[in-house]
Amino acid sequence: MKSAFNKLRPNFWSRLTPSSDGDYFFVELEDAHRTWHPGDTVHGNVILVLYKPQRISSVDLSFAGNVVVKSALVKGKGSRSVLFEQKLRLHGTPTAGSNSNTTPSSGNHNSHVSNSATNSNRNSGSHMSTRTSNRNSNSHVASNTPSMSTSPTSTSSGVAATADTTTTMDTNTSQASSTAPDTLNPSSSTELSRTATRQSSDGSIWRSVGSSTPGAASGGVADMMMNSVTTEPVLSSRMSMHTTNSHLSQMSRESHVTTASRESHMSRESNTSTSSTSEELEIGEHRFAFILEIPQKGLFNSLEFERGSISYVITAVAKRHGPLPALHAKRVLQLVCPVDVARLPPPKPSTLSVEIQKRKKQQGIITTTLEVGRGGYLRGESFPVKITIQHVKCVKCLRGLVVTLCRFSKVTCNDDEPQSFRKDLSQTVSPLYTDPVTFSSTVSTTLRIPPDVFPTTKGHGLVSFNYCVEVVIDLAGKWDLEEDRTGFLHTDRLKRNKGVVSLWTEVIIGTDRRRYRSDSHATAHTNTNHVTNHVSQNHGSPGHVNFGHVPSPSGSSNHGNGHGAYGVGHASQSSSPGNHSNYSYHGNPNHGASHINNHVTAGSSHTSGGLSEKQLMKLREEALLPSEPAAISSPSLDAFPSAPEYAIGDEVAGSSAGPSAPSAPAHTIAGVVASAPLTPSDKHENELLRLQGLSSDPYADEDHVPQYKEKEKAPEEVVAMQLNELASVPPIEGEIEEVGNSANAPSAPVMNGHEGGFFDAPSEFSESSAPPVVHGHVHGHVHGHSHSSTGTIVSGDASASAPAPTSIRSVSTAPSDTPTAPPVITHGFTGPVGPGVVDPGTSGTASTTVDSLNSEISSGTPASTLPDTNKSLSDSDDIYS
């Protein structure tokens, strides 16, 4: 039955779900997932959702920071200390103590409380007239254009009253009786209220216009007014409440106000404390905006420990009329006080000395030192701990050192005695073995800070949280320890044993580590500019070495002037700081190293002389230059796009290269590489060159391996392949006899005229589109390693052999009556196959070559003068290089 009645409730637009009692009350922040810091400003709203009309007397808001310590004896009891507290009234009549700000560490923040009543009495008339005129103008605009339902907020006497109008019933004015009643369509009012509610959810403050019914024409108009709260700049409050729906019966009941009640209320206008204490709010979602400012001093990090907590809570209370209980809502703020550990000085070593005074045993002093690397660390980091012991005897203990990271908490509340607590966070156990000769021992261990601990908090009398590293040492070496069930050893019990000492040092755990530009970095940057400019001015001329030589990666190195110099041109060094990649080499390689060494030696010799401090600093800056050229340097990417390829041994002398990429002689490269040292003495410069080399060539850091060309096939294999090609040609009549007669006649290949060059197949066959037919007999076949599928088939008769290939020229073809010879297949060549050379100035083609052969054959040249194809192929060493 109850669920059936719930369906009959009026529906209105709301993003919220009702609670068990039918109402919903909570605090909403504009930035809900933010971590707050001292001095920040908090913006938010107190939202009240009503599913039936109720009388709400007041809505109060308080913001307080508390330190709570639980009782160790009685469960559920404890003490509470207030760091600061702020109170303000969001809805209802302000009282003498409704708006206050109590901060122990700040000045007077509640001066406006005593003057709130005076300001209200002095400005009540102006507030009333302004609101009446605004209400009338807004009602007129709303009746004509329902879409415009907002108006600017009202001010009085220069005091900003940042608040919104509400749908409450107030009878503070007498001019409303003479004002014509305004009417609004209920549907239009609903749309306007929904729009206002949606816009208010974005954080903006809107002013809704109330609606009245036609039944209220004779009785008057319900006032849409609010009670302003005078605030100060430090703690300001805004009050905003929107109604999302209105019903005809509700509005008619609220707008029915008699003239007598208005006149009686006007008589009590001068005393605001006697105004109505409860106002009926309609069905809908009501929003009360507020602004709070967090104090800048006297605060601690939000945390919870075993015996208490430090919290910052925003509490809202809505008091309802009658016996109904008040509504409470809380919102906890996570406050973090920044602690920067970047500039904390390193802690001093903690030293403990124990003097041994016994008659029977050896006397002396045992010294123990505890060192921690830095003064502060962040949560989740690990830090080293070093313990140094100088003993008087040899000690061997398997578990002689216990290093513990612990937290000490000290809390004082309500003028009670301070309460101290300790909690172990991390612990390591290490063996203790002293040297039998020196009786000394150095132990290094590592402790890890848990990520869930809170930062160091101190500087206030109420609470303090410090972190310490405690070391317990068994100097006697008689421990027999067993681990506790929780994994931590109770050091308090160990300290009671004989021959046990302990020492500790403080460690600060911060919230962040900011990067600062130190003065040393700026000085180093200035020195780098000075050194670079000095090198550009003094060592930029030819004949000097600028930080080593640069081999040409692309193999386009230039031969020198006949003295074996190896360089890459006159590339000047850049003077920009940090750019050491554009180095150049000119002249003798050994001259640069000796020049720099002499320069540094001279600078060192001047140091002993009576020079000024400025001159000494200049010499020291010059000493930062590398003492010899680097063995491996990385040029710029624009000048040298790839890595060099060197040849070793006979390959350098025997390899053939084109005219566009000549290589340096082997003795020149060997001399340059040998003259460069393996490891420069300047470590910083060597590391800089190595990193820059890796940026351009990832393999520059590895040992150089000479790049060899792919090994070609042996001449015998090539001859076999060519014979297979000839075997595929169909046999011709008389082929056997002709082959037998010309077996010993060598043939010469056609070259392109360059020693060690290549045969240009397209240019040779450019003038003949079809294979010409020549009558004659050719003794032998002309073969070559083909790189093109294009070939020329020549058939003809010949009675004589061809002359030597060096005398091949373009002559006319002479016909002959000899039998037809087998076809000769001439393929394009990729390399020299014989001593024959074709003049590059002669534009010879395939047909011209065959005509020359036939002409020489017809002239009666002996067959023995033709070169042997097989012999020339086998005797040539650099054919396939």
From Swiss-Prot:
Cellular component aspect of the GO annotation: mediator complex; transcription regulator complex
Pfam families from the UniProt entry: Arrestin_C, Arrestin_N
One GO BP annotation of this record: positive regulation of transcription by RNA polymerase II
SMART domains (UniProt xref): Arrestin_C
Polar residues bias (residue ranges): 117-128, 178-215, 242-261, 571-587, 595-610, 846-873
Residue spans of biased composition, Low complexity class: 93-116, 129-177, 269-278, 523-535, 551-560, 787-796, 810-819, 828-845
Region: Disordered, residue numbers: 90-223, 242-280, 515-612, 779-881
Role this protein plays: Required for the proteolytic cleavage of the transcription factor RIM101 in response to alkaline ambient pH.
PANTHER family: ARRESTIN DOMAIN CONTAINING PROTEIN, PH-RESPONSE REGULATOR PROTEIN PALF_RIM8
Family: Belongs to the arrestin family. PalF/RIM8 subfamily.
Protein known as: pH-response regulator protein palF/RIM8
The species this protein was found in: Yarrowia lipolytica (strain CLIB 122 / E 150)
Lineage of the organism: Eukaryota, Fungi, Dikarya, Ascomycota, Saccharomycotina
